Every structure is written in structure tokens, then in C-alpha cells.
Amino acid sequence: MLRLASGADLAFAAQAARFGDDAMTVQLIVTDEGATRVITLRRPEKKNAITQDMYRAMSAAIDTAQNNPAIRCLIITGGSGVFTAGNDLEDFLSDGTSNTGTARSANNAIKFLYSLAHNVKPIIAAVDGVAIGIGTTMLFHCDYVLASTTATFSTPFIHLGLVPEGASSLLMPHTMGYQRAFAMLVMGRTFSAEDAQVAGFVNVVVSPGHTEAEAKKVAREICKLPAEAVAISRRLIRLPPEDMTRRIDQESHLFGERMRSKEAVAAFKAFFSRKKA
């Protein structure tokens, strides 16, 4: 079930979806607090692993903010203790694969990434705890990232026989340099909050349990600035959205090919075997 603020857009409300087997379980909460839209992943029992429905709802939350002048800023958070473990792999693979070999559910993740790439509103991430896979790559689409001292960042695509996604092969080297991007994307190195701040993709490190509150302070600061000047300046300093979506498409094609590879099949088999053990 999706919980909406009372003033949320009708178009967004129309896209609200029920999540999970238990209709009372809220897996995504979207609230409009003043001029800020807060998108909260709320699936702690699965470390906020993202399902197809959650991707669709996050895309809707971002897309409906674009032409809403009342929304000046966006925040993505996982609440206290965990940001997200990335894709829910069982859900990701449950819909089968397309003729390119990509999981059909990947289309929902790609739509979410497109929403991030085309987003024109400042977006802040509040990361408390683990950020795995797309939980890390989505941060490179954000304008400001806060992390707790216990936050960790990892992209274990290679260990699953796969390749980078989310335009991370473009954005990571652009943000933190080739060598650091290689260490994270190819070698699968985990970055601490301090590592991430030194690398340049985390702005501020705060105490655990305080990332969301601090993110809201940053949002209020941004919302006080002249909106048009912010939008123009943001557009000037970001990579063009067309570059990002082009790279998302390239990565997705290669990702689909890799899904059919012997390496990926063996890696997924081993992953689920460990999970059942």
C-alpha cells in the first residue's frame, strides 16, 4: 500500500499501488512537507529491497513533481538503519526474461532511472546504513547526499556476472575519477561513508538516525533560493539527461546479454543456494 500526503497530486494518487502479500504493509511512503516531497522506502524486513511496484511508485513520485510548482525539492530516504539492499532479486526475476535476456521487471527500474535522469528538481539522498547496487548508483543522479557514519556503499554487479547499470559507468568516473570508479564498479570494493565523502559523492557525514532530519534542513535551505536560478544553474552543472539515458540504454543492453551468460547463471544459482541454506 502506498501512503500519500493529503495534498499529493491526483495524477500521482491514481498510480498508487498495493505492495506485497500483506495489503496492510506500507513499502513506500510519499509525503509532501511544505515545498519538499519526501520518498521513504519502508521495507525494513527486507532491508528496503526494491520491488517492481516500488520502482513504479518512485517514478510516479518523481514524475508528478516535475510540473508542480509547489514542489521545490525531493528527498529519497530509507529511514533509520538502512537505505536499500538494491533490487529484490526474487521479485526482479519472477516475471521471467525478455527475448534480450533481461528480466522484464528491469523495465520498471529503467523507467525509474529515466525519471532520475530527466528530473529537474533538486534531489537529496539521506543514506543511513547499507546502499547496495542501485541503492548506490541512484546517488550519482542526486544533487546532494548525506550519509550516516555507519553507511556503506557497494555495487556487486561483477560478482553476479553482470555489468554496471543506472548510467553508473558514466557518472561514477565523472564524479570520482576512473580509478575509484574501477575499484567500486569492477573490483566490487565497498566504500565507507568517509571513503564516499573523500571520493566526492557524499556531501556530509552525520550521526546514525539523523540523515533524514539533516536532509530536510538542506531542502529548506534550497527551497529558499530563487527557483528559476536554481533550475538553470543545476542544468548547467549537470551532464545532459540525453547522455545519461543513452548510457542507461547501452548498459541495459549489455546487462541483458550478461543475464544469459554462464557466469551470471552460475552466480545467481550460488546466490539463491546460499540464501536457502
Range-by-range predicted roles:
Residues 111-118, 126, 132-186, 199, ...:
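CoA-thioester-processing core
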Residues 188-195:
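Acidic, divalent-metal-coordinating active-site segment for phosphoryl/phosphodiester hydrolysis
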Residues 78-118, 131, 243:
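Glycine- (often His-adjacent) and acidic-residue-rich active-site loop
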